[in-house]
Amino acid sequence: MTSVSARQIDAIIERHAALQARMATGDMAPADFVAASKEFAELEPVATAAREVVRLREELVALNEMLADPEMKAMAVEEIAAVEAALPAAEHDLALQLLPKDVADSRAAMLEIRAGTGGDEAALFAGDLLRMYSRYADTQGWKVEIISANEAEVGGYKEVVASVSGQGVFAKLKFESGVHRVQRVPVTESGGRIHTSAATVAVLPEAEEVDVAINDSDLKIDIYRASGAGGQHVNTTDSAIRITHIPTGLVVIQQDQRSQHKNRAKAMQVLRARLYDLEREKLHSAEASARKSMVGSGDRSERIRTYNFPQGRVTDHRINLTLHRLPEILEGAMDELIDALIAEDQAQRLAGLGE
């Protein structure tokens, strides 16, 4: 386990106290007060964890000194055991607080689900995944808004893009990127044979205009008449938008809204998220040699999870976790899965700090 030095702990506590004292004076410019308040709030849980480590370490020193007193020795031995049992957990909690934060963790996310191998069954599975994430979002108090959807004739989706907004969305959904595989007997299968299908999930942190500089000269915008399933026109105006980002070749098509203006706004929302994600991928690649985390790799071609209907199980291959709760998970009971992925990522990053 990575141990936090006494010097680091002192620096944390001193900085927290200094910020508190400075804000209490009332002699700060509004902008400075806002900045100090933000830093103070971010430092609060770290300082609390640091003080708990200090308390336990000091208590351990005092108890060890009591061992020299014959009358106090028995009690001291018992209390030393209790403190020694509590200290590693407190130090672990502090180390977690000190891990570098992903600046995107607090952001909303763009959720993209695409049917892969398996034809109609893959499209139905893509629909099941959207429902699973939507139900999970409900349990978290998040809002899900469909940005664009290419529905399959049999049901489900060939491709669907949704915006998920709320507290800490990306932090919890970011490990969902990858290939999700389903094994089940399709409703159209008369012989009872199990088929394997797949869908690809991409979770991108939503980006603000200030995050990504997009020059109008870098965009090629095509406007045309929107069409629905089978090619029929869904309205009589040229409202569909196709935006091509020339430097990267990224293409976003948006036709779900009747208003050209709304379609353009949503297309730009998706484009910003994809460009921001590209920048994050470059940064991740640069850090890859320093941090070999399978959980956080974000490789969207990697098979990450299997949903096996005959056995009623869900297996996450990255952490070798199998849960025999498939119906509940598909209804949004994803906490156990997501918490396990977050814990494994934290463990790997802590191990990286200790190397």
UniProtKB/Swiss-Prot annotation:
Organism: Sphingopyxis alaskensis (strain DSM 13593 / LMG 18877 / RB2256) (Sphingomonas alaskensis)
Disulphides: none
Gene name of this polypeptide: prfA
Keywords carried by this UniProt record: Cytoplasm, Methylation, Protein biosynthesis
UniProt-annotated location(s): Cytoplasm
Main location: cytoplasm
Organism superkingdom: Bacteria
PANTHER family, per database record: LD18447P
Keyword tRNA processing: no
UniProt-recorded name of the protein: Peptide chain release factor 1
Post-translational modification, as annotated: Methylated by PrmC. Methylation increases the termination efficiency of RF1.
SUPFAM superfamilies the record matches: Release factor
GO MF assignments: translation release factor activity, codon specific
Entry annotated with the keyword Cytoplasm: yes
Family: Belongs to the prokaryotic/mitochondrial release factor family.
